[in-house]
C-alpha cells in the first residue's frame, strides 16, 4: 500500500497520550502492543499524559491528534 510502514496509523485510531503533548509528545495506539510508541502533535491545546486521543491526520508518519472528551 501507499505510505504504509511500521509507523502507519490510520485516521480514527484511538490512542493513549504517554506524555504531555505540548504540542508534540508520545502516544500509544490502543489497538497495538504495549511498547509501540509514536510521536504525535496535538491539534489544539495541551493534552495531558493519560488522556485518550484520536488520530485526525496521518501524513508521512506525522500524526496529528485531538483529545477525545470522555
Residue ranges and their predicted role:
Residues 2-70:
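Terminal membrane-proximal soluble interaction domains of membrane-associated proteins
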